[in-house]
Regions:
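Short, well-structured beta-strand-loop connectors
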Residues: 74-84, 116-132
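Secretory targeting and sorting signals
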Residues: 2-28
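Zn2+-dependent peptidoglycan hydrolase active-site motif and core
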Residues: 78-114, 137-140
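Acidic, glycine-rich catalytic/binding loops that coordinate metals and/or anionic ligands
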Residues: 4, 29-43, 68, 115-124, ...
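Conserved beta-strand positions that form and line the central face of beta-propeller blades
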Residues: 66, 96, 109, 131, ...
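Short glycine/threonine/proline-enriched tight-turn/helix- or strand-capping micro-motif at secondary-structure
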Residues: 45-77
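Generic beta-structure capping elements
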Residues: 50, 98-100, 113, 144, ...
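Short acidic/polar mixed-charge low-complexity motifs
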Residues: 43, 73, 102-106, 147-150
Length: 167
């Protein structure tokens, strides 16, 4: 390596380090509210099966997570939203809630879930929306961001990633 090449590499590394060392301006969530989702059980629950999206939308995969909760457990809204659906799908009781999250809707689904709400009803974060039916041994919790796009609902409980300056 020539001295000129070494100098160029050093200058590039120094410029990158200087850029990374600059503090980024903090950005609050719209309205200043907490954008994190709440666990549907009110607090973290043991996860039986984690989110494992398929390589293609038509393939099998886990489009949410299964939480280890007994029948009768109250289910709470993960965030403020509007109940999109509450009723049976393929003989399973389902609740789906549409949440606005920084301008983009996210639909949370809870299966099996005996509804204590109706479609079109506005709900607030932490409000009881249903219960895990008696005899059920888990709750499937999903999050959909589009017609065929899914995300891990457990990651939404963590909130946005925030970079902090080095001091």
């Amino acid at each position: 390596m020539t001295p000129r090449t070494r100098l160029r590499r050093f200058l590039r590394a120094a410029a990158a380090a200087a850029l990374l060392a600059q503090p980024l301006p903090a950005r609050a969530a719209p309205g200043g509210e907490d954008q994190r989702w709440m666990w549907p059980t009110g607090s973290p629950s043991p996860v039986l099966s984690s989110f494992a999206p398929p390589a293609h939308d038509w393939l099998p995969g886990r489009r949410g997570g299964d939480l280890d909760v007994p029948g009768g457990t109250p289910i709470v809204a993960a965030a403020d939203g509007v109940v999109a659906f509450a009723g049976p799908v393929a003989a399973q009781p389902v609740i789906s809630v549409e949440h606005e999250r920084t301008g983009s809707p996210v639909w949370a689904t809870y299966v099996p879930a005996q509804a204590e709400v109706e479609a079109g009803q506005r709900v607030v974060r932490g409000q009881v929306i249903g219960r895990v039916p008696p005899g059920a041994d888990h709750l499937h919790w999903g999050a959909r961001t589009g017609r065929r796009a899914y995300t891990d609902p457990i990651r939404l409980t963590l909130g946005p990633v925030v970079l902090k300056p080095w001091e």
